[in-house]
C-alpha cells in the first residue's frame, strides 16, 4: 500500500466565495504531496528558496495525471479533513475528476474523520502534532491566502509541504503505536 499525504492551499477564503459549499469557487494556489521520502509541490508561481529545498516542483496542471497514476497503482491519499475540504476542492475547482475514483473506492485516509468518529470531537492538526510529536505547524491556515496575495509564495509552499509531512508523520505514529495524542478543548484534558 502506497500512502501519499496531500494538502492544498487556496488564494481565497471561504467567506470570499459564500462559504465552504462553493468548492468550485476556490482558487488553488499550491498542492503538496509527501510519501514519507519524496515531496512534490504543484505550483504555477515562481519559487526562489523553496526550489532549492530538494523537493520536486511541478505545475498545477500535472497534478491530475500524477494522482490518476497513484490511484491506478492502488495508492491511497492521506490528509487531515481531506474528505470535506481538499478532495472536493481538487475535484470541483481544478476539474481533477479522478478524485471521484478515490472517494468511491475509499482509497483515502482522513485523520480528522477517524478521530471524530472515535472521540466525537474535532481535533485541529496543530493540536495533534503538538501533543503527539511535540512538533508544530509553520502558520495558521488562514494566513496562507494573505501571504500568497503578498507574493510570499515560498512561505506558503513551505507551509503546505510541512503540513503533508506532519500528517504523514502523525499517521505513521498512529500506525506504529496504536494511538495519537490530543488535548480535548471540550473536556479540558489530554486524550
What label would you give each PLM region?
Residues 7-9, 110, 163:
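Acidic active-site catalytic centers that drive phospho-/nucleotidyl reactions
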Residues 128, 132-190:
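Acidic, Mg2+-coordinating catalytic module of metal-dependent nucleases/exonucleases
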Residues 40-122:
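Conserved DEDDh/DEDDy metal-dependent 3′-5′ exonuclease domain
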Residues 1-69:
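Conserved RNase H-like, two-metal-ion catalytic cores of nucleic-acid enzymes
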Amino acid at each position: 500500500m502506497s500512502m501519499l499525504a496531500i494538502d492544498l492551499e487556496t488564494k481565497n477564503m471561504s467567506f470570499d466565495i459564500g462559504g465552504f459549499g462553493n468548492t468550485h469557487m476556490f482558487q488553488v494556489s499550491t498542492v503538496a504531496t509527501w510519501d514519507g521520502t519524496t515531496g512534490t509541490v504543484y505550483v504555477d508561481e515562481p519559487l526562489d528558496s523553496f526550489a532549492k529545498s530538494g523537493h520536486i516542483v511541478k505545475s498545477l496542471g500535472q497534478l491530475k495525471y500524477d494522482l490518476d497514476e497513484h490511484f491506478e497503482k492502488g495508492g491511497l491519499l492521506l490528509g487531515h479533513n481531506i474528505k470535506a475540504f481538499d478532495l472536493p476542492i481538487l475535484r470541483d475547482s481544478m476539474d481533477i475528476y479522478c478524485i471521484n475514483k478515490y472517494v468511491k473506492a475509499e482509497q483515502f485516509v482522513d485523520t480528522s474523520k477517524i478521530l471524530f468518529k472515535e472521540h466525537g470531537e474535532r481535533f485541529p492538526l496543530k493540536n495533534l502534532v503538538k501533543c503527539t510529536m511535540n512538533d508544530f505547524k509553520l502558520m495558521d491556515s488562514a494566513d496562507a491566502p494573505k501571504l500568497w496575495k503578498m507574493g510570499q509564495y515560498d512561505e506558503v509552499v513551505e507551509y503546505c509541504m510541512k503540513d503533508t509531512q506532519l500528517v504523514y508523520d502523525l499517521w505513521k505514529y498512529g500506525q506504529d503505536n496504536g494511538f495519537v495524542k490530543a488535548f480535548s478543548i471540550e473536556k479540558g484534558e489530554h486524550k
